Amino acid sequence: MESRATAKFMRVSPRKTRLVARNIDGLPVEDAMNLLRFTPNKPAGVLYDVLRSALANAQQMPGVDVDAMVVKQVVVNEGPSWKRFLPRAQGRATRIKKRTSHITVILAEGQE
């Protein structure tokens, strides 16, 4: 059985989130949660919340052994960017893109 959770429009950069997501792919859920809990950056906290949500979704399914769940796949896609302007010297302005991410975590039973 598979369990999934999705977080959309999260205010973290997709590029930085993929760096953290690559580390938990294929790990048992308990190990992945420990790794994310002690990783000191913003994408780790967001991924931790999505992983907890996927685990809670798995607990709602009958006949699923939550202790044997592994992270099957972590997908980080780019969401829409917020465009902002930063004032510069002599009346100029620079555009800043505040990027967002769509994050999906898929858990599966068994060892992979």
UniProtKB/Swiss-Prot annotation:
CDD domains: Ribosomal_L22. InterPro entries: Ribosomal_uL22 (IPR001063), Ribosomal_uL22_bac/chlpt-type (IPR005727), Ribosomal_uL22_bac/org-type (IPR047867), Ribosomal_uL22_CS (IPR018260), Ribosomal_uL22_sf (IPR036394). Belongs to the universal ribosomal protein uL22 family. The lineage of its organism: Bacteria, Pseudomonadati, Thermodesulfobacteriota, Desulfovibrionia, Desulfovibrionales. Coiled coil: none annotated. One of its GO terms (biological process) is translation. One of its GO terms (molecular function) is rRNA binding. The keyword Chloroplast does not apply. It comes from Nitratidesulfovibrio vulgaris (strain ATCC 29579 / DSM 644 / CCUG 34227 / NCIMB 8303 / VKM B-1760 / Hildenborough) (Desulfovibrio vulgaris). This is Large ribosomal subunit protein uL22. Part of the 50S ribosomal subunit. This protein binds specifically to 23S rRNA; its binding is stimulated by other ribosomal proteins, e.g. L4, L17, and L20. It is important during the early stages of 50S assembly. It makes multiple contacts with different domains of the 23S rRNA in the assembled 50S subunit and ribosome. NCBIfam families: rplV_bact.
